[in-house]
Structures are given as C-alpha cells and as structure tokens.
Amino acid sequence: MGRKKIQIQRITDERNRQVTFTKRKFGLMKKAYELSVLCDCEIALIIFNHSNKLFQYASTDMDKVLLKYTEYNEPHESRTNADIIETLRKKGFNGCDSPEPDGDDSIDQSPLMEDKYRKSSEDLDILFKRYGSAVPAPNFAMPVTVPVTNQNALHFSNPGGSLITQSLMTSSLTDPRLLSPPQPSLQRNTVSPGLPQRPASAGAMLGGELNNSNGTCPSPVGNGYISARASPGLLPVSNGNSLGKVIQAKSPPSPNQNSQLGANSRKPDLRVITSQGGKGLMHHLTEEQLEMSVQRLGGVSQATHSLTTPVVSVATPSLLSHHGLPFSAMSTAYNTDYQLTSADLASLSTFSSPGSLSLGNVTAWQHQQQQQQQHNQPQQLIPVSLSNLVSSSHLPHTATLTVNTNPINISIKREPASPNRERSTGTPLSCFSHQSRHEATGRSPVDSLSSNASSFEGNDREDPRGDYTSSLGLLRPSGDTESESQSVKRMRLDAWVT
C-alpha cells in the first residue's frame, strides 16, 4: 500500500509547515546517518528554517568537516534545486510530486518489513478461511454436564429436532471434571429416582407436550436451557436437595414414593401449573402430584392466560392477612378414593373470586357432589369457616359454609404458612385474603375449623406451625333431613357479602 503523493510547493499553513519540517528534517538526518555508516563518509548538514533558526548535523565533528570544506580546492559536484528537478525529470519522475515520508521512512518501507507484513496477512487469511465461516447451525448437539443421580433417565430434546445421544450424555456425566454445581439462573431438568416427581416448568406443561412418557419435559427455550424464572421446579428446596423434578404425565408414582414424602420437605418455590389445550390434565395427575403442585401455588403465576384446572381451597390459616396480601392456599392432599374429575373441575371454576361466589354456584357445586357420592357412603356435613376464604371485614365470625364431603374418618391438619407472595389477578384460581391474627382467638370451634374438601392421610402432611391451633367441631351425621340442611345452608350463605 503506497503512500499518498504531495505537491512539492510551499506549504501555506503554518502548522502543517512546521509538522512537515520536523518530519522531513529528521528523515534527512537519518538518511545522512545511514549513508555515513554504509559508505564510510563524513557528512555535515546545515539547515536554517523559515524563521532563520539553525539546525545542523555532522557525522563526526562539524568544525572538522567545515575546515576540510574550506580548504578543498579541487573541482567537485555541486547541486541546487534546479539540478535536482532536472535530474528527476530525466529519470521519469514528474518533479512536482513526491511521496510523503515520515519519521521512520526506512523502517516502514524496508523489504524486510514488507515481507513480514505480507506473511502475517497470508497467515490471517488462512485462519479466516479455516475458522471464520464455522458458524454453528441452529440444530446442533452439544454435551451438557449436569449433576444427576440417574443417568439412564436423562434424554434431553432440542426443539430444533436434534437429540443428544445417550452415549454422549453418559460420557459427559461420568467425567468427574465436567460435573459442576447447579447454577440458580440456568439449569437443566434432572431426574432423581425415589422422590416424588413434580412439574419442572410452567411453560413446559403446555399442549401436547404432556404426552411424553419418558419422564422428561421438553425445554421451552431454544438452546435447551430453562431459566430459573420460567422453571420453578429447578429452584432448590429447603431440605438441601437441589435436584429439580420433572412430571411424568401418564405414570403415577408408586405408593412407596408417596410414603417418602418427609414432614420436613417444605417447598419455598411455589408456582402455578398452567395448561393451554391440555385436556384432562387432572386425570393423569395423582393425588400426591396434586399435593406438590398445589403447594407451589403461592408464587406469582408466570402465564397470562386463564387456567383450565381451577381448584378451590377451604383450608387456609389466617396468618398473613395483616399484610393485606392475598395468596391462594390450596388443599394439599387428596385421597385416592376421591380424585377430582373433569366435571368437578368445571364446577370449581366458579370459585374464581369472592364476587362470583353466589348461592346458585355453591348449590350447583354441592348438588353435583351429592350426585357423585350418593351411591357410595352416607354423607356428612362439615361446617367450614368462611373467614378463611374472604376477609373478616366482609363476613361475620359465625358465618359458615356447609360443604358436602364423603369420608368417614376425618383427620384434619393445620395448614402450613405459605410464602409472602402475590398472585396475579388474571387467573380464576381462588385468591382470597386471610383474616387477621387477632381473630384466631375467642372464636367458636366452628369458626376455627380448617379442613380440606377431601380427606387425606396424616403421614403425607407437613409439620404444622406451633403457634397456630385448629379444632374440629360440629360434625353432623347425614341422618338429618334434607330440608333442614338446605335451610341451614341458605341461612349461613345469606351472610356472605359478595
């Protein structure tokens, strides 16, 4: 790459003239030095600038060179500007233009440096041709190192269509140097055998993805990872087990897995299971999975669409109502004899807000429950405090809701405290404020009753809080007349302020 040509004429700009003088003066002295060394000669330069300032250069000593000059009387070569211009014309140069030199003229334009630059450019071109265009395709397989306890159950799927092979996954997992602790912001779904499986992500439960029977959920993110915000199942639980669980849609857990739920396994990461077009989702979930799913309902819902599996709660402790924060506390255990059906879920969808809880909705729901249970066992009536569903400012202490239920031996436990989180208002799940703490004392056994809509076993429950007490009271047998039951229910529901 050549240097630009400049016109050889007087520079009018003072600053440019000074810069050019400094550069070319040093270049001239450098050329004189090279000539004196290469050819073993004595050189003296005497320069006066436009302001009559003297600059001189001598290869040895200026006085000695000047003395030899004054004493020399032999004919010699003497040139002026006109002679130089004439010589340049004869050699083919224009005489009016010259390359713009710089201070390091000889170093920059030496053949050695040009060869070095040319070789470096060729090496860079080879590297760019070899690696420059190697852009990874969208559908590529990459080894993923995640800490797991069961290598046979891992089979990740890429939305692009490529699958990670089992041998590649096994080789990556067996190398102890590749295993790293799970990060809170970016993790894979892992499977832990022997533990109850829970939904790994609210986004991974959508549509036809429930038909996977290999125990995994496809990743909703393009690169195969699931962020911690979109995958609540990957957050570590309080008992130290940081492995996330994935749901198995069509294979319910065995009874021994149900019995392994310890009383100290509290789930601080509560989420909502959402489904778009997932018909009959509750049919594939057993009671234990419903328990774990419902316990995760205290956090903010990650989806903005309506839920197709609404569940109503009749058992919530009034521990956090003084903050004025509504959260959904669902009944967290179900017996296998009283699994909810799609008709139950359709009727439960009316319990979306306190304003939509009317007498007709409750009567329709109770009538449907009576039709399903009239051929099994005698019915019993349990009065449940409505102050657990709505705030105390809308309902007297003595107002109760009569719920038809079917168990014979009822074991009522206390509901553990849920995290202090808010629910989004766009979901039809029950989001009711809890009553204040001062109402827990001085109430009748009817008001302090906190029961679930279906019976559950005591070994599947978590440890209750020590500062909260609940009592069972006023269990009336089903031998009472139907008219008395209806009149009592209407009288109690009249106090419900909607």
UniProtKB/Swiss-Prot annotation:
Residues 412-424 have a biased composition (Basic and acidic residues). It comes from the Eukaryota. Residues 1-100 are annotated as: Interaction with hdac9. CDD domains: MADS_MEF2_like. Residues 3-57 form the MADS-box domain. Its main location: nucleus. Residues 425-434, 447-457 have a biased composition (Polar residues). The keyword Magnesium does not apply. Residues 58-86 bind DNA. Restricted to the somitic mesoderm of early embryos and to the body muscle (myotomes) of the tadpole. Expressed in all tissues examined in the adult. It is found in: Nucleus. It holds the Pfam family SRF-TF. GO terms for biological process: cell differentiation; heart development; positive regulation of transcription by RNA polymerase II. PROSITE patterns: MADS_BOX_1, MADS_BOX_2. Residues 173-215, 243-267, 411-498 are annotated as: Disordered. The keyword DNA-binding applies. Keywords: Activator, DNA-binding, Nucleus, Transcription, Transcription regulation. One of its GO terms (cellular component) is nucleus. GO terms for molecular function: DNA-binding transcription factor activity, RNA polymerase II-specific; histone deacetylase binding; protein dimerization activity; RNA polymerase II cis-regulatory region sequence-specific DNA binding. Belongs to the MEF2 family. Binds DNA as a multimer, probably as a dimer. Interacts with hdac9. May regulate muscle-specific transcription in the embryo and may regulate transcription of a variety of cell types in the adult. It binds to the sequence 5'-CTA[TA]4TAR-3'. This is Myocyte-specific enhancer factor 2D homolog. It comes from Xenopus laevis (African clawed frog).
